[in-house]
Amino acid sequence: MREEKSKTNKLAWSKKMVRKWFNIKSKTEEFQADDPSSAGIEVEHRSSFSAEKAPSTIKNTKTEKLSKNWEQQARQRRMNYENPRIIDVQNYSIFVATWNVAGRSPPSDLNLDEWLHSSAPADIYVLGFQEIVPLNAGNVLGAEDNGPAQKWLSLIRKTLNNRPGTSGTSGYHTPSPIPVPMAELDADFSGSTRQKNSTFFHRRSFQTPSSTWNDPSIPQPGLDRRFSVCDRVFFSHRPSDFDPSFRGSSSSHRPSDYSRRPSDYSRRPSDYSRRPSDYSRRPSDSRPSDYSRPSDYYSRPSDYSRPSDFSRSSDDDNGLGDSPSTVLYSPGSAANENGYRIPWNSSQYCLVASKQMVGVFLTIWVKSELREHVKNMKVSCVGRGLMGYLGNKGSISISMLLHQTSFCFVCTHLTSGQKEGDELKRNSDVMEILKKTRFPRVKSSEEEKSPENILQHDRVIWLGDLNYRIALSYRSAKALVEMQNWRALLENDQLRIEQKRGHVFKGWNEGKIYFPPTYKYSRNSDRYSGDDLHPKEKRRTPAWCDRILWFGEGLHQLSYVRGESRFSDHRPVYGIFCAEVESAHNRIKRTTSYSASRVQAEELLPYSRGYTELSFF
């Protein structure tokens, strides 16, 4: 009996290794998620949702199929005219982060508060990791080590479901010291030294405070130092209007200089029939929606404004429009100058999906009240490592449907190397990931979307260690880093160069970068690793390896930030997005009487969190 069991185990192990080595996919990709019935406490292993109907044993003729399709379309058109759908468009906040942890397993007391609690609680957390295990032969060719992944899940769960300072640690740690956090990008870097003696300014928070949260007993996050940028600064989901008469200097700012009067936000757009994406194109417009739900925060006019003392770069491809010396805010601020406290939502978060492929690890968390609206979870993995298909490099893609809007989150670790031509290998990785990522089609309601590849989704966010380097020598790049000349560095950034040439990520967006390169640092240090090496030894040129990009309408980036943890030789990078999500409701008209066709007044007003449309198709 024991011999038979042993043979069975060996056979199962052999099959698993063959599948791993040759990247043979099972019919459904398994992933880990919380059991919905256990309120996010227990974890279960699930398979990608696939509701393909069994093929019929009787094959219909082509004429019968066409006739049936025509009848269904005619019936659907008639129903759409008789019963128009009410489409609610709501705004949800998404926290997206990527971190290469250099093969280090997290200690149980690792503090993630400064990372995950650096902003107002988001509706969705998308956290991607690379190298959660060492990329040695044992982990690449052998059985998968999921021990570190479980540790990360435990730490994330504890951090998200606890207020800052109560996650079992001594609260917020002092962030790593950063010399001269901001630079005047529009100055002449060869002769400008104004920023060298400037002090760090307490940047304003984009969180929405309320006067009801003045309780000093509520633990609050400490002010953090981060290099940050907002592609289009939104506060409470409205573009922040700026005062044209305001003129500020980069050397001294008062908190009051960045505050707005409540009357400045009394304006509302007169045409609410436009989508929020229409308003986002115009900085002067206001958008009638709040950053968070009414249940989470009380409405209050924003105190944040963007000063008008900024200049547009002539080279928009480098993403250097607004100078960081004038766009000042901090997602880590705990209160504004009026003393308003920032509450931390006590609602629980649950794990909806997590997947590991060797060192790549992607995990998605949502607020518990959203869990029932998340459907059609599907996972697809593409290996691009050894021999072109092993999982030490590659991607994990997770597809999901939130209400009626499809999302795809792609976590990648691309080919490394800083030799000339290595960027072409990374381009090839991206193309192969887009080509080979496939999701099983779901056949359920006709109204539910079931994308089968990445670009078919409504909203796509791509994160990870993309490994694109800066095409300069170590000495030249280091000199520009010390000058904080991000523009010159970005002009030599391989990703920007390849994207501008149309070789990769054509049509994709990335936020403006105003933080130093995130790779490669000496262990537990703020020094780049090349500083500790002999000049004749091989040095890693500082580079922005860790990136977040997005594709599709209805996504607005609120911030693009780097963290300062010394845990790895990479610095974590995260962005906060506002995502438009559609939810459709069918209103059945039984009669044409006045009472049946009456529209409530509330439906004509803009929602505090979105807006409403009528759709006949």
Curated annotation (Swiss-Prot):
GO term, biological process aspect, one: procambium histogenesis
Gene Ontology MF terms in the entry: inositol trisphosphate phosphatase activity; inositol-polyphosphate 5-phosphatase activity; phosphatidylinositol-3,4,5-trisphosphate 5-phosphatase activity; phosphatidylinositol-4,5-bisphosphate 5-phosphatase activity
Tissue: Broadly expressed in emerging organs. Mostly localized in procambium of growing organs. Restricted to vascular differentiating cells of young organs.
Annotated region described as Catalytic 2, given as residue ranges: 538-553
Entries under SMART domains matching the protein: IPPc
Coiled coil: none
InterPro entries from the UniProt entry: Endo/exonu/phosph_ase_sf, IP5P_plant, IPPc
Mutagenesis or variant effect for G575D: In cvp2-1; induces an open vein network
Catalyzed reaction equations: a 1,2-diacyl-sn-glycero-3-phospho-(1D-myo-inositol-4,5-bisphosphate) + H2O = a 1,2-diacyl-sn-glycero-3-phospho-(1D-myo-inositol 4-phosphate) + phosphate; a 1,2-diacyl-sn-glycero-3-phospho-(1D-myo-inositol-3,4,5-trisphosphate) + H2O = a 1,2-diacyl-sn-glycero-3-phospho-(1D-myo-inositol-3,4-bisphosphate) + phosphate
Keyword Metal-binding in annotation: no
Compositional bias annotation for Low complexity: 242-253, 291-311
Pfam families reported for this sequence: Exo_endo_phos2
Effect noted on mutating A543V: In cvp2-2; induces an open vein network
Compositionally biased region (Basic and acidic residues): 254-290
Further information: CVP2 overexpression impairs protophloeme sieve element differentiation and overall root growth. Cvp1 and cvp2 double mutant displays high PtdIns(4,5)P2 levels.
UniProt-recorded name of the protein: Type IV inositol polyphosphate 5-phosphatase 6
Organism listed in the record: Arabidopsis thaliana
